[in-house]
Structure formats: structure tokens, C-alpha cells
């Protein structure tokens, strides 16, 4: 019997993750996520970080992709996509959720409401298979202006001299383009949320997670955005205006206090802000979380 929950929030954990930072991220989720959520740590660290986190936080679930002592090689391109696809399939069969949210180890929750808002939006429009920082970033930057550059990378993979990769890319893109895919369109991975319907459609799609994609030089979020189109669904914005994500690819561009004040619920990347390093950024978010008006 699948485990029932409102939202399932999964955290992929790779090698060289600082354990204290991992716990800080997990605890922020437990504080701010919807009360009926479940938290799944996906341990790809080859260092046993999942077992250590489970010991510290018995309420979390752990999926181990690499046991301690395994080869710790890691990339964020096609190889990561194949592992995330495995995670999505596992989650879809193991849990009965309405929304599947991804948070990276350099992300935090700092206000409540992100998962609840996603469930409401996707429930009101079944075509919205994935939400995230899509065409417009939280600060108003036009991300769509960057799509053509990513589109060129997609085309290079489509025309790869590796015929196995080129073949699956052509098959995937043929269906995605028939459903309105724009070359290079993509939702930023951290903070992205897929609907239950999207996860079921992806899990049933024959090419989803195919090992041949491990050779791709596309990021995991580039590939997932193509797959969302291929299964007949769409992506939508979840960061601009009063929407809950405050995410950038690299360091934060707004201070922790401004992000909390603006009502952003998920922030990325907390590795830095201005002159602050990750320790200082995380400490400031913890301070803000302890202030009653931010609770």
C-alpha cells in the first residue's frame, strides 16, 4: 500500500555534502512544509549520509542509490537525470502524493506555503505538469531570453556523433516538439514541483530514464523539461511576483531578510550572498525563523 501524503519532498544528496548543512536543509523542510508532507532523502553520496541523517531525524525516509565505498564519481548532466528518473519512478510507486518537490542540499525552506500553493495551481490546471523558475525569475529577469543558448546545446546532443544518444534525443524531441516544446525551454531544478499526473505519465513513458541519456551533456533540468512536453504536459512559472520560489542558479541575489519578507518559501543557492559564505547565510535564515513574526 503506497504511503499517503500531500506533498513528497525529495532531496538528492551527492558526494562531498557537508552533513551539518544537509541537516539544516532537512530541518528547514520539516519546519515549513505542509503538515502532511513526507521527506525523502535520496542518498547518492557513497558516504552513508542517508543513514546518518535517518539516525538524527528518524521521521525521514531514505532511498540509497550508492552504498558507502562505491565509486563516488558524480555529474549533474545526463547521469544525474537517469538517477532522478529512477527516484521519480520509485516515489510514484511507493507514495500516494499530490505533488513531488525537489530541494537541493544548498536550498532551504524559509516560509510555509510552497507545496500547498503548487497543489492548488496544478489542481486548477491539469496541464501544468511542472512548476518552478521557468520563464521569469523571482527578480523579474527574463529567463526565456536564455533559452536559445540552451537550445543550441539541445541541438548538439540531438546531432551527437554518438548514435545511441542522438537516436533517443531525436525520438524524444519529435514528440516534445509536436506538443509545443521550444528548444531550450526549461524549469530550474531546485524548488521544481511535478504533479502526480506528470510523475505517472513520465513513469509510463518508455524513454524516461533510459541509460542512453547518461551520455547527454544536458543538465537534468533541461532533459526533464523536454520530457514534460513529450508526455503532453506543460511547465509553468512559480517564482515571479508573489509566487513562492526565490531561486537563482548560483548565489542569492536578495538578502535572507528580503526573501523572507517577500514571502518566498524556497530559496537557492544558499552557498553565498554578497560577502557572506554558506555558514553565514544559513545562520541568518535560522535567526529569521526564530523571530515570531517570521514563523
Residue ranges and their predicted role:
Residues 1-27:
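N-proximal low-complexity "stem/linker" segments adjacent to membrane-targeting elements
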Residues 24-36:
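Short, acidic, metal-binding catalytic loop of nucleotide-sugar glycosyltransferases
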Residues 49-98:
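Active-site-proximal specificity loops/subdomain of glycosyltransferases
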Residues 80-85, 187-191, 217-225:
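Conserved glycosyltransferase catalytic-site signature
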Residues 97-108:
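Short beta-strand-to-loop acidic/aromatic patch adjacent to the donor-nucleotide binding site
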Residues 108-212:
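Conserved catalytic core of nucleotide-sugar-dependent glycosyltransferases
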Residues 201-295:
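C-terminal catalytic/acceptor-binding lobe
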Amino acid at each position: 500500500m503506497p504511503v499517503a501524503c500531500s506533498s513528497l519532498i525529495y532531496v538528492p544528496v551527492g558526494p562531498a555534502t557537508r552533513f551539518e548543512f544537509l541537516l539544516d536543509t532537512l530541518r528547514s523542510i520539516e519546519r515549513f512544509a505542509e503538515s502532511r508532507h513526507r521527506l525523502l532523502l535520496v542518498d547518492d553520496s557513497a558516504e552513508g549520509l542517508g543513514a546518518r541523517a535517518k539516525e538524527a531525524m528518524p521521521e525521514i525516509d531514505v532511498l540509497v542509490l550508492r552504498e558507502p565505498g562505491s565509486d563516488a564519481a558524480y555529474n549533474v548532466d545526463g547521469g544525474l537525470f537517469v538517477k532522478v528518473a529512477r527516484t521519480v519512478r520509485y516515489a510514484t510507486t511507493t507514495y500516494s502524493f499530490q505533488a513531488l518537490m525537489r530541494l537541493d542540499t544548498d536550498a532551504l525552506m524559509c516560509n510555509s506555503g510552497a507545496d500547498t500553493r503548487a497543489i492548488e495551481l496544478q489542481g486548477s490546471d491539469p496541464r501544468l505538469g511542472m512548476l518552478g523558475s521557468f520563464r521569469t525569475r523571482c527578480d523579474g529577469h527574463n529567463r526565456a531570453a536564455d533559452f536559445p543558448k540552451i537550445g543550441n546545446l539541445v541541438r548538439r546532443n540531438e546531432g551527437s556523433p554518438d548514435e545511441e544518444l542522438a537516436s533517443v534525443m531525436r525520438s524524444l524531441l519529435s514528440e516534445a516538439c509536436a506538443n509545443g516544446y521550444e528548444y531550450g525551454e526549461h524549469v530550474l531544478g531546485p524548488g521544481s514541483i511535478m504533479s502526480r499526473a506528470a510523475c505517472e505519465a513520465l513513469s509510463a513513458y518508455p524513454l524516461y530514464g533510459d541509460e542512453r541519456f547518461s551520455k547527454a551533456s544536458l543538465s537534468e533540468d533541461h532533459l526533464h523539461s523536454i520530457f514534460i512536453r513529450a508526455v503532453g504536459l506543460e511547465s509553468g512559472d512559480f517564482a515571479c511576483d508573489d509566487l513562492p520560489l526565490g531561486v537563482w542558479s548560483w548565489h542569492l541575489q536578495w538578502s535572507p531578510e528580503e526573501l523572507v519578507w517577500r514571502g518566498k518559501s524556497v530559496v537557492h543557492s544558499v552557498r553565498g550572498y554578497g560577502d557572506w559564505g554558506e555558514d553565514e547565510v544559513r545562520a541568518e535564515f535560522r535567526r529569521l525563523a526564530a523571530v515570531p513574526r517570521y514563523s
